[in-house]
């Protein structure tokens, strides 16, 4: 089949890499415009663009597909000219109007990192961890104009381990998503079968995964230890949980566990112990053990290194 691929980050590049290895013809790759990145703020191509160029695939980077502008209409016409059988979309980042969704013969399929209709939206992986979900997965859906509202065609399931961060779960789901889209697109008859058997989402089961904002990564010590640990894992690698040091500087918390220690009478935020396992901090309920901390301008430190800095003390109350 002739496939158009649209995606931007590593999550999408994993799926594109898998599709490149199939007999299908990748006729075009769409990705977001190059962005400034790194300390030098150099224009950097997305992981999807880098992979596409390595395989000599045509890359297109329109700003939008809006019918209200000449640029948008030109982008629509350019896409239609590829005469694709199907378009695969994974974390692309641009809104696709209905005219684009209807352009390929079999429409547009989306690789979404959750078990829809739970966690529609921008941050499904992070929200699943923060909510304490026992499992998540990947849904392949036929795209509709609404936000992740399309009919579901195929699902894979992935348990969320107690040690999972958004970074580790992201990698697992990227691999599952790549495998899932290759299953759905194994051949044209297989695609027709999945389209015929697709399932409408139950709107009563919908939960939205709202976009992350930096402010919510500040640790609230009045929460229980289990929730604080979930948040720390959910916000790794971005925006990273933090403890304010002063008006401008934060202590970043990369990793944690729920401590076995108990301190029912300790003030929330108080350091009750420091050992080889980590920095044990009293919470609203329970104790959380911080195992990787990063001071401004430094690298992330393990528990032994943290103690050696002598920057934290037992009895100290964290902000």
UniProtKB/Swiss-Prot annotation:
InterPro entries tied to this protein: Fmt (IPR005794), Formyl_trans_C (IPR005793), Formyl_trans_C_sf (IPR037022), Formyl_transf_N (IPR002376), Formyl_transf_N_sf (IPR036477), Formyl_transferase-like_C_sf (IPR011034), Met-tRNA-FMT_C (IPR044135), Met-tRNA-FMT_N (IPR041711)
Catalytic activity: L-methionyl-tRNA(fMet) + (6R)-10-formyltetrahydrofolate = N-formyl-L-methionyl-tRNA(fMet) + (6S)-5,6,7,8-tetrahydrofolate + H(+)
SUPFAM superfamilies in UniProt: FMT C-terminal domain-like, Formyltransferase
Annotated binding of (6S)-5,6,7,8-tetrahydrofolate, by residue: 114-117
Keyword ATP-binding: no
Keywords noted in UniProt: Protein biosynthesis, Transferase
Enzyme class label: transferase
CDD domains associated with the record: FMT_core_Met-tRNA-FMT_N, Met_tRNA_FMT_C
EC number: 2.1.2.9
GO molecular function list: methionyl-tRNA formyltransferase activity
One Gene Ontology cellular component annotation held by this UniProt entry: cytosol
Function, as annotated: Attaches a formyl group to the free amino group of methionyl-tRNA(fMet). The formyl group appears to play a dual role in the initiator identity of N-formylmethionyl-tRNA by promoting its recognition by IF2 and preventing the misappropriation of this tRNA by the elongation apparatus.
HAMAP family attached to this UniProt entry: Formyl_trans
Family membership: Belongs to the Fmt family.
Protein name in UniProt: Methionyl-tRNA formyltransferase
Organism of derivation: Acinetobacter baylyi (strain ATCC 33305 / BD413 / ADP1)
Gene: fmt
């Amino acid at each position: 089949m002739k496939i158009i691929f649209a995606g931007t980050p590593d999550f999408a590049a994993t799926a594109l890499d898998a599709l490149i290895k199939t007999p299908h013809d990748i006729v075009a790759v769409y990705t977001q415009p190059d962005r400034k990145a790194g300390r030098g703020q150099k224009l950097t191509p997305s992981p999807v663009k880098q992979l596409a160029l390595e395989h000599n695939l045509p890359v297109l980077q329109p700003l939008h597909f809006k019918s209200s502008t000449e640029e948008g209409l030109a982008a629509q016409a350019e896409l239609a000219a590829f005469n694709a059988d199907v378009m695969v979309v994974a974390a692309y980042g641009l809104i696709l109007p209905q005219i684009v969704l209807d352009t390929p013969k079999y429409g547009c399929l989306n690789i979404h990192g959750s078990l829809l209709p739970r966690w529609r939206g921008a941050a499904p992986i992070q929200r699943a961890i923060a909510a304490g979900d026992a499992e998540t997965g990947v849904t392949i859906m036929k795209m509709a104009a609404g936000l992740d509202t399309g009919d579901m065609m195929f699902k894979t399931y992935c348990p969320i381990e107690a040690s999972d961060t958004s970074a580790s779960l992201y990698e697992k789901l990227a691999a599952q998503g790549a495998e899932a889209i290759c299953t759905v697109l194994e051949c044209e008859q297989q695609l027709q079968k999945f389209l015929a058997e697709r399932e409408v989402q139950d709107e009563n089961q919908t939960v939205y995964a709202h976009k992350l904002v930096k402010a919510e990564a500040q640790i609230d010590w009045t929460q229980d230890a289990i929730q604080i640990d979930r948040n720390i894992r959910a916000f790794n690698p971005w925006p990273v949980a933090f403890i304010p040091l002063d008006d401008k500087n934060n202590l970043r918390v990369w990793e944690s566990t729920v401590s076995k220690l108990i301190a029912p009478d300790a003030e929330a935020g108080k350091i009750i112990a420091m050992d080889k396992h980590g920095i044990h901090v009293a919470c609203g309920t329970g104790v959380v053990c911080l195992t990787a901390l990063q001071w401004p301008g430094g690298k992330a430190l393990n528990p032994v290194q943290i103690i050696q800095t002598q920057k934290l003390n037992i009895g100290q109350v964290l902000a």
